[in-house]
Amino acid sequence: MIRKAFVMQVNPDAHEEYQHRHNPIWPELEVVLKSHGAHNYAIYLDKARNLLFATVEIESEERWNAVASTDVCQRWWKYMTDVMPANPNNSPVSSELQEVFYLP
């Protein structure tokens, strides 16, 4: 498994709405994530800084990257644009984090 972590932002007035939209995520999005090899996906909110920290274990970079081209992912990104900064293609603005420590 490949461990990934990344950081995103959430609008200051949208913390509750962001959480509401993820509890639960759309069933079809869950199916796509799992069928593309995503496991143990978690997102954490830092309310003081309006930051979201995400971790996910993936089976391959290729399968993970393929999620972005699915219809359900495209619809999800568009759905989330009013609660978080987005790129021109509606994907969330995010930065990958470098792992500096891991205790198995």
Swiss-Prot record:
Disulfide bonds: none annotated. Pfam families: rhaM. One of its GO terms (molecular function) is L-rhamnose mutarotase activity. Keywords: Carbohydrate metabolism, Cytoplasm, Isomerase, Rhamnose metabolism. GO terms for biological process: rhamnose catabolic process. GO terms for cellular component: cytoplasm. The active site is at residue 22. Signal peptide: none annotated. It is found in: Cytoplasm. Its main location: cytoplasm. It is an enzyme of class 5 (isomerase). Pathway: Carbohydrate metabolism; L-rhamnose metabolism. Substrate binds at residues 18, 41, 76-77. It catalyses: alpha-L-rhamnose = beta-L-rhamnose. InterPro entries: Dimeric_a/b-barrel, L-rhamnose_mutarotase, Rham/fucose_mutarotase. Its EC number is 5.1.3.32. Homodimer. HAMAP family: L_rham_rotase (MF_01663). Belongs to the rhamnose mutarotase family. PANTHER family: L-RHAMNOSE MUTAROTASE. NCBIfam families: YiiL_rotase. Involved in the anomeric conversion of L-rhamnose. This is L-rhamnose mutarotase. It comes from Escherichia fergusonii (strain ATCC 35469 / DSM 13698 / CCUG 18766 / IAM 14443 / JCM 21226 / LMG 7866 / NBRC 102419 / NCTC 12128 / CDC 0568-73).
